[in-house]
């Protein structure tokens, strides 16, 4: 299949950079893409930065409409926010896409002992390392984003061996794999994207973990709809507004005294998320910030 590489180059003030990147990513997500490649913003003036987000569009009968929608949404973003967007389009085939995409990801050490290894990279494990082998396909990253890295750190810090773990919006399955390798007895994941469910299952198998039965399960569902049990540790690396929507029902799947780890939150929306979680019976016990991204650890009140 032929693909069209669509890049949105954005320029904004440095304090708005992460928010701008999230807004640009959302354009691609709203068009139905399951994942994008994000390039870190670089300074272009005393207070200005330039970044780029890349998505890959299939060359099919819907391409012209998708391209027009992309241009319209980028223009609308520039009109509503202090962001100037420029679009770039480059044709490529499957092989070009695979090479370009893989060049963005490397072996990464996260937390104390977690190592995320893209399957196309070599790595000799050191004693004590927890190595996660990932091949996320076209749809997902490999833990390099600050929100994923912070979630991994919190799972490593707070997961007790033998406990039950649930990941909401599991994506590549990276948090499920980490939890199982860190000693969780039960590992479940849920995602509303069928591509995510497939890729997560493949990544689990790549790490010697097989979904099926109560010990390890991946479900396609909207948030925690269909989850019929409670867990000791629940993660949700999703957008701020989705966490707020999740909060009304998430207490049902967290045991009393259990923990909820939320990431994907930008600093301007932190107070909104914390207020909602508190109103829904959670105490915020830990906060971590990287760049403008926030990760919260909340305990369900007994």
Swiss-Prot record:
Q: Which reaction does it catalyse?
A: L-lysyl-[protein] + 3 S-adenosyl-L-methionine = N(6),N(6),N(6)-trimethyl-L-lysyl-[protein] + 3 S-adenosyl-L-homocysteine + 3 H(+)
Q: Which residues form a coiled coil?
A: none
> Which CDD domains is this protein grouped with?
AdoMet_MTases
Localization annotation: Cytoplasm
- Name the positions where S-adenosyl-L-methionine binds: 148, 169, 191, 237
Q: Which InterPro entries match?
A: Ribosomal_L11_MeTrfase_PrmA (IPR050078), Ribosomal_PrmA_MeTrfase (IPR004498), SAM-dependent_MTases_sf (IPR029063)
Q: Which domain of life is it from?
A: Bacteria
GO MF annotations in UniProt: protein-lysine N-methyltransferase activity
A Gene Ontology CC term for this entry? cytoplasm
Q: Which UniProt keywords apply?
A: Cytoplasm, Methyltransferase, S-adenosyl-L-methionine, Transferase
Q: Name one GO biological process term.
A: methylation
Q: What is its EC number?
A: 2.1.1.-
Task: Kindly give the HAMAP family that the UniProt entry links to this protein.
Answer: Methyltr_PrmA
Q: Which family does it belong to?
A: Belongs to the methyltransferase superfamily. PrmA family.
Q: What does this protein do?
A: Methylates ribosomal protein L11.
Q: What is this protein called?
A: Ribosomal protein L11 methyltransferase
Query: Which species is this UniProt entry from?
Result: Desulfosudis oleivorans (strain DSM 6200 / JCM 39069 / Hxd3) (Desulfococcus oleovorans)
């Amino acid at each position: 299949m032929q693909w069209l590489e669509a890049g949105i180059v954005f320029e904004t003030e440095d304090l708005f950079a992460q928010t701008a990147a999230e807004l640009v990513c959302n354009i691609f997500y709203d068009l139905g893409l399951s994942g994008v490649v994000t390039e870190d913003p670089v300074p272009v003036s005393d207070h200005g930065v330039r970044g780029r987000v890349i998505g890959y569009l299939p060359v099919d009968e819907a391409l012209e409409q998708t391209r027009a929608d992309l241009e319209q949404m980028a223009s609308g973003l520039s009109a509503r926010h202090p962001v100037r967007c420029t679009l770039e389009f480059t044709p490529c085939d499957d092989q070009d896409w695979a090479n370009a995409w893989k060049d963005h990801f490397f072996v990464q050490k996260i937390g104390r002992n977690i190592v995320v290894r893209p399957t196309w990279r070599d790595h000799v494990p050191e004693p004590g390392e927890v190595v996660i082998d990932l091949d996320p396909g076209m749809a997902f990253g490999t833990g390099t984003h600050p929100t994923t890295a912070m979630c991994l750190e919190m799972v490593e810090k707070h997961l007790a061996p033998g406990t039950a773990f649930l990941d909401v919006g599991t994506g590549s399955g990276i948090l499920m794999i980490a939890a199982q390798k860190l000693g969780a007895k039960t590992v479940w994941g849920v995602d509303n994207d069928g591509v995510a469910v497939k890729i997560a299952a493949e990544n689990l198998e790549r790490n010697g973990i097989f979904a099926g039965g109560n010990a390890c399960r991946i479900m396609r569902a909207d948030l925690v709809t269909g989850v019929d049990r409670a867990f000791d540790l629940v993660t949700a690396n999703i957008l701020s507004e989705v966490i707020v929507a999740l909060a009304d029902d998430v207490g049902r799947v967290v045991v009393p005294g259990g923990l909820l780890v939320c990431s994907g939150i930008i600093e301007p929306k932190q107070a909104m998320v914390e207020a909602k979680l508190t109103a829904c019976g959670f105490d915020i016990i830990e906060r971590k910030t990287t760049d403008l991204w926030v990760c919260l650890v909340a305990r369900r009140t007994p």
